[in-house]
């Protein structure tokens, strides 16, 4: 379940694309881990966009800083864009986040949680 929220702006890339963009499932297949380990896709767009920092709380929720602005004013800083802090939760404990809540969407030049 995704909480209703204002539509997020499209990401703005300040650099030329040097590698092809992969879908989350394709990127997951490209990850190599040691024998006995596995990786699992827990969240992807549109549930989370432009993540720059994450932190777990005591309840097992993942707090994510989404950055739509940039810390350097010279690099595409738009006053109308706002950064967000969202909370992702795995309510059925299957390892995949199924609940998203916007905690704060009024940040500007956010750099961490």
Regions inferred by a protein language model and the residue ranges of each:
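Beta-propeller domains with acidic blade repeats across secreted/periplasmic ectodomains
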Residues: 2-113
């Amino acid at each position: 379940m995704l909480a209703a929220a204002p539509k997020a702006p499209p990401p703005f890339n300040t650099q030329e694309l040097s590698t092809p963009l992969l879908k989350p499932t394709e990127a997951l297949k490209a990850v190599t881990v040691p024998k006995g380990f596995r990786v699992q896709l827990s969240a992807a767009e549109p549930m989370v966009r432009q993540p720059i920092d994450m932190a777990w709380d005591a309840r097992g929720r993942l707090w994510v800083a989404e950055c739509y602005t940039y810390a350097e004013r010279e690099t595409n800083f738009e006053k109308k864009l706002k950064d967000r802090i969202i909370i992702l939760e795995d309510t059925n404990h299957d390892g995949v986040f199924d609940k998203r809540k916007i905690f704060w969407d009024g940040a500007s030049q956010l750099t961490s949680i």
